[in-house]
Amino acid sequence: MPQNDYIEEHIRRHGRRLDHEERQRKRAAREVHKASAVAQKVTGLKAKMLNKKRRNEKIQMKKTLKAHEERDVKQASTSSDPNQALPTYLLDREGQKDAKALSSAVKERRKDKAARYSVPLPQVRGIAEDEAFKVIKTGKRKQKGWKRMVTKPTFVGESFTRKPPKLERFIRPMGLRYNKAHVTHPELKASFNLPIVGVKKNPQSPLYTQLGVLTKGTIIEVNVSELGMTTTTGKVVWGKYAQVTNNPENDGCVNAVLLLSS
């Protein structure tokens, strides 16, 4: 084996290739696919050794993530100097130990904002991908299967423009598109047929939210301007969140309950 550093010497003298960073980036991106292919093909003792190695890597990764999370948390410091005198107005306060310069007050405010709404359905059944999407065969020989047709009801906005058919991956049928929902006001005990403004959150996955899939437990935004709701300053409320409480694919309509801030 060579004992000298001729490679490093050449790099110092002549530099690297012009596309060195691009090649490194592509190589790093390929490593994931190579590791996946090896994990699927390997068997026997090599598979056991690989699984053990991956398990140790995941454990180490979880420990690192936990350490980062603990670094961000503000803790009360118990190691205060008892000999140090404190003013009277500071005696009832706990010493704060900042792990970061950023205050955790912003995070607490976000948590409080998220807890303002009590959701009628906190848990829903998971939907498999085979249940929500149907494979569409394309191509001259009908051998390509990269297109999917959404088999669940969806909401498509007025400003939506279809892609060219050769580039459209997800197809949302016109017969399964809904623009209005039967929204029940929990305090008034009355239902209103309100237009849907958008899909805020689908509990299944971000892809379902992006496609506007309406399943049980989905948080939608509805236009409540005709209800005459106002804010404390007297402004008319235009949009409110509501949660879908039924299975629209079975009932043929969207039923939802209005989410009111507590």
Swiss-Prot record:
Major localization class: nucleus
CDD domains to which the protein is assigned, alphabetical: NSA2
Gene Ontology biological process terms from the UniProt entry: maturation of 5.8S rRNA; maturation of 5.8S rRNA from tricistronic rRNA transcript (SSU-rRNA, 5.8S rRNA, LSU-rRNA); maturation of LSU-rRNA; maturation of LSU-rRNA from tricistronic rRNA transcript (SSU-rRNA, 5.8S rRNA, LSU-rRNA)
Gene Ontology cellular component list: nucleolus; preribosome, large subunit precursor
A Pfam match: Ribosomal_S8e
Chain spans, region Disordered: 1-38, 53-85
Ranges of Basic residues composition bias in the record: 53-65
Bridged cysteine pairs (disulfide): none
InterPro entries given in the database record: NSA2_fam (IPR039411), Ribosomal_Se8/biogenesis_NSA2 (IPR022309)
Compositionally skewed regions (Polar residues) per UniProt: 75-85
Basic and acidic residues composition-biased segments: 18-34
Short motif (Nuclear localization signal 1): ranges: 11-18
Taxonomy, superkingdom: Eukaryota
Keywords, ordered alphabetically: Nucleus, Ribonucleoprotein, Ribosome biogenesis, rRNA processing
Annotated family: Belongs to the eukaryotic ribosomal protein eS8 family. Ribosome biogenesis protein NSA2 subfamily.
The protein's assembly and partners: Component of the pre-66S ribosomal particle. Interacts with NOP7 and RRP1. Interacts with RSA4 (via WD repeats).
Function according to Swiss-Prot or TrEMBL: Involved in the biogenesis of the 60S ribosomal subunit. May play a part in the quality control of pre-60S particles.
Protein name: Ribosome biogenesis protein NSA2
Organism of derivation: Mycosarcoma maydis
Lineage: Eukaryota, Fungi, Dikarya, Basidiomycota, Ustilaginomycotina
Gene behind this protein: NSA2
